[in-house]
C-alpha cells in the first residue's frame, strides 16, 4: 500500500510546499534545510544547477542566471501584456520563441533557453525528491494546485511540468478548493455553504468565493492583484531603512546590490517577527562601507508604512462579492491562506469588514493549500481511512520545551510530540534566601542539562518580596498556540507580579535533521546524562540536607531543647559540608552520598534525642530530593515537586 502513495504539491509563485497523507493525518514535509516551504527558484552556475533554498541563497551573487516567478510565465504567450510588463522587473532574460516565452541563462559556460514548464518541472522535481527522501521510496502520483483564475492553457502547462518532472498528475485542483478541503469545509453537511478564501502570498493576492454543496465545489468568483504580496511589504521596509541609513550615516546604499539584498533578508525576518511581537530589531554587521546597522521597528510603524497596501486588499474582496452576487452576511466561512495573512493588521481589516466574524486560521497559512492537496491525493488513490472522511488537524511540538532550574538542569514543561495547541503550568521557587528575582531561561531539546539544549529566550521576574529560600511560589506557564508560537509567563503568587516572553517558531530554529540528530544523540547520551542527573541530584540532596539541618538547630523554637555542645557539633559539621560543597561542585555522585552519610551520622543521633525529648520538627521531613541546588551565576530557579 505504502508504495503507491500520492503527494499534494502547492506550486507557488515564490514558494512551494509538499504534503502527504499517511498514518491517518497530513504531514507537511520539510526539505533538507528543515524548511516546510521551498523557494520556487532555479539557479544556473558555471558548475551546477541549484533548486530551492540553495538557488535563492545565491541570488545576490548571480542574479542574471537565477530564475523565479516561472508561474507568471507558464501557459502564456510572449506577447501577453502580463509577460511584457513582468519582464521589466526581472533580472533574468526572457526571449521570444514562436510567441512562446523562454528564459535565457548561462549554464556551465553555455547559453541555454528553457520553457517555463521546464523551470516549473525542476521545482516540482525538487518537491518530489523532498517527499521521497522523507518517505524512503519513489513517488509518482501527485495532485498539483493552481490559482482559480488559471485558464486551460495555464492548467495544461502546469500538468506538462508535472509530467516532465516524472509525475503522474492525478488532478490539477484550485488552490482555494484545496484550502477549503484542508479545513474540512466540504464535510460540514449543512447544505450549501459560501466560503471566501483570502490568499495573500509572497507575490500574489487572490480572493475566491466558493460554493460547497454536498462535496461539490463551485468557484463563484475570483478577484485579486497578481502583484501584491509579502515582497511588497519587504520593499516598503527596505525603502524605510535605506532612508534611515541616509539620515544616520549620510550614505546611500540603494545602488549596492549586496547591501540591499542583505537588508532585504533582514527586513523579511523582521516582518515575520512583527506578526507575533510588537517590535523587531535588525542587526546587520558591516552593511555598507564597514558600517554596522543596528536598528529596530515597531509593529505600528510597519503597519503605517504598508497601510495603503493592507487596505487595498479589501477592494478585491468587495469585487468578488459583487461578482458572486452575494452580500457579506451570506458568507459562512472565511479562510486565510498565504504567509502574509499572519500579519495581524491584515486579519483585523478582514475581520472588521465582515463585522467581527471568526477567521479559519488554525492550519499554517503557507501550508493550507498543500495540506488540502494531500487530502485530495489520498482520496483519489482510494484511501478508505475514516480520517480522510473526517479529518482532524493535530500538530505536535517537535522538541521538549522547558526551563533551567538550579544546577543547569533542564526541567521540561511540554514534552516532545505533545499535540499543540497546549498549555502547561508548574510552580517553582527561589534558591537562596531573600532572592529578589528569578531568571527564566527557556530551552528546547531532549538533554538533561540545559547547556546541551537550544536556548530560545530568557527574561527576569524581579520584585519578589524577601523570604527564605523555597518559600516564594513562582507559577510558570508554557502556552503554545496552533501556530507553534510559544508564550512563557512567570507570576509571583504572593504579589501577582508577572513577566512574559513570546517565542515564535521562526523557521531558523532547528531543522528536521537537527531534531533527528538531537533525538539520536539523546539516545546515545542518555547514559551520560543519567549519570550527570544523578550527580546533580546527589549534590542537591546533600546541600539541601546541610542547609535544612543548619536552620533546624538554629530554630528559636529549639532553645533549651538541644544542648549547646550538640548544636555546635551539628553547625560545625554542616558548615564543613557547605564549605566542601563550594570547593567540590564537580565531585562524583558517590562522594556526595558519602558526605551525606557522614553528616547524617553526626546529626541523626542528636535529632532522634530531640524527638524523644519533645517531638519537634524533624529534619527528615525536608525531603531528600530537596531543591535542585547547584552552582551557576545569577538568580536561579528551582522546581517544587
Swiss-Prot record:
The modification N6-acetyllysine is found at residues 77, 108, 246, 348. PROSITE patterns: HSP70_1, HSP70_2, HSP70_3. NCBIfam families: PRK00290.1. Component of the CatSper complex. Identified in a IGF2BP1-dependent mRNP granule complex containing untranslated mRNAs. Interacts with CHCHD3, DNAJC7, IRAK1BP1, PPP5C and TSC2. Interacts with TERT; the interaction occurs in the absence of the RNA component, TERC, and dissociates once the TERT complex has formed. Interacts with TRIM5 (via B30.2/SPRY domain). Interacts with METTL21A. Interacts with DNAAF2. Interacts with PRKN. Interacts with FOXP3. Interacts with NOD2; the interaction enhances NOD2 stability. Interacts with DNAJC9 (via J domain). It holds the Pfam family HSP70. ATP binds at residues 12-15, 71, 202-204, 268-275, 339-342. Residues 2-386 are annotated as: Nucleotide-binding domain (NBD). The N-terminal nucleotide binding domain (NBD) (also known as the ATPase domain) is responsible for binding and hydrolyzing ATP. The C-terminal substrate-binding domain (SBD) (also known as peptide-binding domain) binds to the client/substrate proteins. The two domains are allosterically coupled so that, when ATP is bound to the NBD, the SBD binds relatively weakly to clients. When ADP is bound in the NBD, a conformational change enhances the affinity of the SBD for client proteins. GO terms for molecular function: ATP binding; ATP hydrolysis activity; ATP-dependent protein folding chaperone; disordered domain specific binding; heat shock protein binding; protein folding chaperone; transcription corepressor activity. Its main location: cytoplasm. Residues 617-633 have a biased composition (Gly residues). Molecular chaperone implicated in a wide variety of cellular processes, including protection of the proteome from stress, folding and transport of newly synthesized polypeptides, activation of proteolysis of misfolded proteins and the formation and dissociation of protein complexes. Plays a pivotal role in the protein quality control system, ensuring the correct folding of proteins, the re-folding of misfolded proteins and controlling the targeting of proteins for subsequent degradation. This is achieved through cycles of ATP binding, ATP hydrolysis and ADP release, mediated by co-chaperones. The modification Phosphothreonine is found at residue 636. It comes from the Eukaryota. This is Heat shock 70 kDa protein 1A. One of its GO terms (cellular component) is centrosome. The modification Phosphoserine is found at residues 631, 633. The modification N6,N6-dimethyllysine is found at residue 561. Coiled coil: none annotated. The modification Omega-N-methylarginine is found at residue 469.
Amino acid at each position: 500500500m505504502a508504495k503507491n502513495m500520492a503527494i499534494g504539491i502547492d506550486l507557488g509563485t515564490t514558494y512551494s510546499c509538499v504534503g502527504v497523507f499517511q498514518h491517518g493525518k497530513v504531514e507537511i514535509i520539510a526539505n533538507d534545510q528543515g524548511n516546510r516551504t521551498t523557494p520556487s527558484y532555479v539557479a544556473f552556475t558555471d558548475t551546477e544547477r541549484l533548486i530551492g533554498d540553495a538557488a535563492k541563497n545565491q541570488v545576490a551573487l548571480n542574479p542574471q542566471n537565477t530564475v523565479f516567478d516561472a508561474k507568471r510565465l507558464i501557459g502564456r504567450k510572449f506577447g501577453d501584456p502580463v509577460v511584457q510588463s513582468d519582464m521589466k522587473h526581472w533580472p533574468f532574460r526572457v526571449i521570444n520563441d514562436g510567441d512562446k516565452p523562454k528564459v535565457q541563462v548561462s549554464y556551465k559556460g553555455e547559453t541555454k533557453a528553457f520553457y517555463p514548464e521546464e523551470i516549473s518541472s525542476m521545482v516540482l522535481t525538487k518537491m518530489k525528491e523532498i517527499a521521497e527522501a522523507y518517505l524512503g521510496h519513489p513517488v509518482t502520483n501527485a495532485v498539483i494546485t493552481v490559482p482559480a483564475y488559471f485558464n486551460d492553457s495555464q492548467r495544461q502547462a502546469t500538468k506538462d511540468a508535472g509530467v516532465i518532472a516524472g509525475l503522474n498528475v492525478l488532478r490539477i485542483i484550485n488552490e482555494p478548493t484545496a484550502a477549503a478541503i484542508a479545513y474540512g469545509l466540504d464535510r460540514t453537511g449543512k447544505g450549501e455553504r459560501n466560503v471566501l478564501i483570502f490568499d495573500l502570498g509572497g507575490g500574489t493576492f487572490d480572493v475566491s468565493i466558493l460554493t460547497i454543496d454536498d462535496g461539490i465545489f463551485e468557484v463563484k468568483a475570483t478577484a485579486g492583484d497578481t502583484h501584491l504580496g509579502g515582497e511588497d511589504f519587504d520593499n516598503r521596509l527596505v525603502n524605510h531603512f535605506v532612508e534611515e541609513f541616509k539620515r544616520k550615516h549620510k550614505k546611500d546604499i540603494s545602488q549596492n546590490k549586496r547591501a540591499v539584498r542583505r537588508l532585504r533578508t533582514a527586513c523579511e525576518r523582521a516582518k515575520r517577527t512583527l506578526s507575533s511581537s510588537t517590535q523587531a530589531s535588525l542587526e546587520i554587521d558591516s552593511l555598507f562601507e564597514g558600517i554596522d546597522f543596528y536598528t529596530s521597528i515597531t509593529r505600528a510603524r510597519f503597519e503605517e508604512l504598508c497601510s495603503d497596501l493592507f487596505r487595498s486588499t479589501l477592494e478585491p474582496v468587495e469585487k468578488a462579492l459583487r461578482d458572486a452576487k452575494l452580500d457579506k452576511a451570506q458568507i459562512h466561512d472565511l479562510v486565510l491562506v498565504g504567509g502574509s495573512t499572519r500579519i495581524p493588521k491584515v486579519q483585523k481589516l478582514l475581520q472588521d469588514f465582515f463585522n467581527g466574524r471568526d477567521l479559519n486560521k488554525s492550519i499554517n497559512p503557507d501550508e493550507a493549500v498543500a495540506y488540502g492537496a494531500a487530502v485530495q491525493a489520498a482520496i483519489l488513490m482510494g484511501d478508505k481511512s475514516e480520517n480522510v472522511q473526517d479529518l482532524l488537524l493535530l500538530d505536535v511540538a517537535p522538541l521538549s520545551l522547558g526551563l533551567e532550574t538550579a544546577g543547569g538542569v533542564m526541567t521540561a514543561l511540554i514534552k516532545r510530540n505533545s499535540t499543540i495547541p497546549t498549555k502547561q503550568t508548574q510552580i517553582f521557587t527561589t534558591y537562596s534566601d531573600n532572592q529578589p528575582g528569578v531568571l527564566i531561561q527557556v530551552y528546547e531539546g531532549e538533554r538533561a542539562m540545559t547547556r546541551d539544549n537550544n536556548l530560545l529566550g530568557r527574561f527576569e521576574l524581579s520584585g519578589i518580596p524577601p523570604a527564605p529560600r523555597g518559600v516564594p511560589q513562582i507559577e510558570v506557564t508554557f502556552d503554545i498556540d496552533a501556530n507553534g508560537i510559544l508564550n512563557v509567563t512567570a507570576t509571583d503568587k504572593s504579589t501577582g507580579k508577572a513577566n512574559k516572553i513570546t517565542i515564535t517558531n521562526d523557521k531558523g530554529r532547528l531543522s528536521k535533521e537537527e531534531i533527528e540528530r538531537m533525538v539520536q544523540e539523546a539516545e546515545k547520551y542518555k547514559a551520560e546524562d543519567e549519570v550527570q542527573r544523578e550527580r546533580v541530584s546527589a549534590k542537591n540532596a546533600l546541600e539541601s540536607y546541610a542547609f535544612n539541618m543548619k536552620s533546624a538547630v538554629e530554630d528559636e523554637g529549639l532553645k533549651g531543647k538541644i544542648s549547646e555542645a550538640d548544636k555546635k557539633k551539628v553547625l560545625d559539621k554542616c558548615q564543613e559540608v557547605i564549605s566542601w560543597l563550594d570547593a567540590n561542585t564537580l565531585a562524583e555522585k558517590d562522594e556526595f552520598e558519602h558526605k551525606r552519610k557522614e553528616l547524617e551520622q553526626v546529626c541523626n543521633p542528636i535529632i532522634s534525642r530531640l524527638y524523644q525529648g519533645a517531638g519537634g520538627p524533624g529534619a527528615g521531613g525536608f525531603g531528600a530530593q530537596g531543591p535542585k541546588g547547584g552552582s551557576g551565576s545569577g538568580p536561579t530557579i528551582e522546581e517544587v515537586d
